[in-house]
Amino acid sequence: MSPQEALTRLIEHREIFHDEMLSLMRQIMRGELSPTLISAIITGLRVKKETVGEIAAAAQVMREFAAPVQVEDDRLVDTCGTGGDSAHTFNISTTAAFVAAAAGARVAKHGGRSVSSKSGSADVLEALGVNLDQTPAQIAENIREIGLGFMFAPNFHSAMKHAASVRRELGVRTLFNILGPLTNPAGAKNQLLGVFHPDLVGIVTRVLHRLGSRHVMVVHGCTGNQGGLDEITIAGETLVGELRHGQILEYTIRPEDFGMKAARIETIQAHDTAQSAEMLRAILNNQPGPPRDIVLLNAGATIYVAGIAESLAQGVKKAHAAIESGAARKKLQELVEFSNRQNRGEVSLV
């Protein structure tokens, strides 16, 4: 399918079929389309609303072009969001990754710099002293040795450079916000994935089912008139799509279900990377309050989908224990030290 044919179909609000989407996405990844065409196509998809088939096909191609990280572990899990929720919260999923790793999960965290938020996962980790410039082998060793590794997306999705300038200039959520969390280079089949719109909960859960995921929770936190979060929220109810044992369930949860008080969205916002890093450290130091509560919920879900807990409630308890014991704080120290020792050549790589 030519990009012009695809654009015509999108203007008519018609779906691009699987094989056609594969072809179109490969053209983008190979740099065969102009920025104008890429912009028109991803905007057209957004306006039409992306289907399960379109998203799954695009994710399949991105996975083909990604540099792989080789890790074999049933506990391997990713925790991330699509971004684009415009809520300006601190880095919740990044903080939750340290807590989940401290509870026994093997976290293959995948993310980048801020595109449509105040601080991306890469921004805050860099501010905390983590070395982002690591090879696939080094990251695999991080995951094996300390239970946590961070894959800086631009280093693993080099073909995305052809769409990067378009995405940055548009500055709005597009197909690529959805694709990032679906294209973990370590191939994590367990995942907590936050989405920026409630309609995407069911869609993305079905995409992950089609892509062969094992246990996932796709979530959208509802915050009333203030929009929503691509996280489990403490400011209202959270819509959940859970894939487990090949079956999909959709339900809602509230902070009160786990003995927590609901809180306003302002209590979990950060104005910049420095404030986000400060909040992350405070949580790992067991400072009580809404920021810690929202991390407990999201870390608990990560622990649950990783197979370390039998239920979300048990996952939250394990997350609390990981913070109280100091184990979560130690994970941050370990990642900073280990990633920088590797960079200096002080760690022998497998």
Curated annotation (Swiss-Prot):
Q: Which domain of life is it from?
A: Bacteria
- What's a Gene Ontology MF term here? magnesium ion binding
Which cofactor is recorded for it?
Answer: Mg(2+)
Q: Name one GO cellular component term.
A: cytosol
Q: How is the cofactor bound?
A: Binds 2 magnesium ions per monomer.
Please list the reactions this protein catalyses: N-(5-phospho-beta-D-ribosyl)anthranilate + diphosphate = 5-phospho-alpha-D-ribose 1-diphosphate + anthranilate
Q: Which cysteines are cross-linked by disulfides?
A: none
Protein's UniProt keywords contain Transferase: yes
Residues that coordinate or bind 5-phospho-alpha-D-ribose 1-diphosphate: 81, 84-85, 89, 91-94, 109-117, 121
Enzyme Commission designation: 2.4.2.18
Which residues does the record give as anthranilate 1 binding sites?
Answer: G81
Quote the pathway field.
Amino-acid biosynthesis; L-tryptophan biosynthesis; L-tryptophan from chorismate: step 2/5
**What does the entry list as the binding residues for anthranilate 2?**
R167
Q: Binding positions for Mg(2+) 1? A: S93, E231
Q: Which NCBIfam families match?
A: trpD
Function per UniProt: Catalyzes the transfer of the phosphoribosyl group of 5-phosphorylribose-1-pyrophosphate (PRPP) to anthranilate to yield N-(5'-phosphoribosyl)-anthranilate (PRA).
Query: What name does the UniProt record give this protein?
Result: Anthranilate phosphoribosyltransferase
What gene is this protein a product of? trpD
